[in-house]
């Protein structure tokens, strides 16, 4: 299921650099992480939904590239983001 506007606003308020921030890597990674978590739960129930599995893999790849970018720009921002999101890295 897609993220609701309220969920997006809450996530962007927590991880964005300011209230209307949608473009910073931190905000994008946080939104992708929520979508990945939702898709993971969906796939636990619907094991044979291969179209959604491919979408999940694409989202994970996009998040990985954004995290790599943040790590290249500022390692401390990267470490803080990974810790706040609870990612294994």
Swiss-Prot record:
Stretch forming the signal peptide: none
Pfam families referenced in this protein's UniProt entry, alphabetically: Ribosomal_S15
BP term (GO), one: translation
GO molecular function: rRNA binding; structural constituent of ribosome
Domain of life from the UniProt record: Bacteria
CC per GO annotation: cytosolic small ribosomal subunit
Entry keywords, A to Z: Ribonucleoprotein, Ribosomal protein, RNA-binding, rRNA-binding
The keyword Hydrolase belongs to this UniProt entry's keyword annotation: no
SUPFAM superfamilies xref list: S15/NS1 RNA-binding domain
Subunit structure: Part of the 30S ribosomal subunit. Forms a bridge to the 50S subunit in the 70S ribosome, contacting the 23S rRNA.
Family, per entry: Belongs to the universal ribosomal protein uS15 family.
HAMAP family the UniProt entry points to: Ribosomal_uS15_B
Function: One of the primary rRNA binding proteins, it binds directly to 16S rRNA where it helps nucleate assembly of the platform of the 30S subunit by binding and bridging several RNA helices of the 16S rRNA. Forms an intersubunit bridge (bridge B4) with the 23S rRNA of the 50S subunit in the ribosome.
Record-linked NCBIfam families: S15_bact
Protein name in UniProt: Small ribosomal subunit protein uS15
Species whose genome carries this gene: Mycolicibacterium paratuberculosis (strain ATCC BAA-968 / K-10) (Mycobacterium paratuberculosis)
Name of the coding gene: rpsO
């Amino acid at each position: 299921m897609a993220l609701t506007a309220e969920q997006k606003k809450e996530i962007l308020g927590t991880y964005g650099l300011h209230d209307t921030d949608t473009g910073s890597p931190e905000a994008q990674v946080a939104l992708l992480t929520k979508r990945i978590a939702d898709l993971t739960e969906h796939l636990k129930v619907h094991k044979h939904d291969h179209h959604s599995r491919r979408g999940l893999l694409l989202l994970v790849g996009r998040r990985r590239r954004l995290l790599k970018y943040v790590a290249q720009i500022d390692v401390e921002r990267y470490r803080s983001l990974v810790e706040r999101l609870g990612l294994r890295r």
